């Protein structure tokens, strides 16, 4: 027996109006979902191996949220949001849902804009139906941030553009608010990035938190900010990158290297087909 599809019921209040209404909410509940950038990787403070508050935790702190839950997972893709993370959002019924996803999708050979849009649309509609404000963070330009050869970074950049367009389309349909990063000069500065150049630094996480809060016109309620100073030498940063990067590469290279090679080949083939 097939279960009938539940129709989406548009809320009586827009997402922009809901953002303004949150200025008067004292017992705010916030939940974060997405990948490692949401999980807090890169926000290490004085201890590089650790994972810190992240930009979502910093927002919760700055807004003095009564409750904050982070259900993000390292390596998560858009397809994981509806099945693995959305149930917690529905159960938690937060005032605000913070989302950042897509980096792991653009790195895969089976990159599918249709799948990404469908998954995000499901998440956004479900969150809005329970009265939540949906905030989606746009992705930065990999050409200016990511490591690796320029040929690969150009492909990643083209795919990030597609994801950002999907986010804008969803926002245009009233399914959330997008906070862009692509055109931000500060967001792409080296100091805003962790030594791995794949995740924000502690300063970068705080910059994102401030950008999101200001975009929503929400005043900072906390008297003090979480520190962003990192008292670690460049020598130790390089040591950490080499040792930890080597471990990561040894673990992932079996399927990562072929995937990246195929990524460049398949993208060139796709562009040739579309140009005919």
Segments the model singles out, each with a brief description of its role:
Residues 43-48, 80, 108-113, 154-155:
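Short, solvent-exposed loop/turn segments at secondary-structure boundaries
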Residues 129-134, 176:
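A short helix->loop->beta-strand "cap" motif at the edges of active sites that frequently abuts
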Residues 113-121:
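Charged helix-capping and loop-helix junction motifs
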């Amino acid at each position: 027996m097939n279960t009938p599809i539940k129709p989406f019921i548009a809320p009586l209040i827009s997402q922009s109006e809901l953002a303004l209404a949150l200025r008067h909410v004292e017992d705010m509940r916030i939940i974060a979902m997405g990948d490692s950038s949401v999980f807090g990787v890169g926000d290490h403070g004085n201890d590089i191996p650790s994972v810190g508050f992240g930009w979502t935790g910093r927002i919760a702190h700055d807004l003095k949220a009564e409750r904050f839950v982070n259900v993000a997972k390292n390596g998560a893709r858009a397809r994981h949001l509806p099945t693995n993370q959305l149930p917690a959002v529905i159960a938690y019924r937060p005032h605000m849902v913070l989302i950042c996803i897509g980096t792991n999708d653009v790195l895969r050979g089976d990159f599918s804009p249709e799948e990404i849009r469908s998954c995000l649309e499901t998440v956004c509609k479900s969150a809005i139906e329970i009265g939540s404000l949906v905030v989606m963070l746009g992705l930065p330009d990999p050409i200016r941030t990511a490591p690796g050869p320029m040929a690969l970074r150009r492909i990643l950049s083209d795919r990030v553009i597609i994801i950002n367009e999907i986010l804008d389309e969803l926002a245009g349909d009233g399914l959330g608010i997008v906070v862009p990063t692509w055109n931000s000069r500060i967001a792409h500065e080296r100091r805003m990035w962790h030594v791995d150049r794949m995740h924000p630094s502690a300063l970068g996480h705080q910059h994102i938190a401030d950008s999101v809060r200001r975009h929503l016109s929400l005043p900072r309620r906390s008297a003090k900010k979480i520190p962003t100073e990192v008292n670690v030498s460049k020598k130790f940063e390089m040591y950490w990158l080499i040792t930890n990067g080597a471990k990561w590469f040894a673990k992932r290279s079996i399927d990562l290297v072929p995937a990246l090679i195929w990524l460049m080949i398949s993208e060139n083939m796709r562009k040739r087909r579309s140009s005919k």
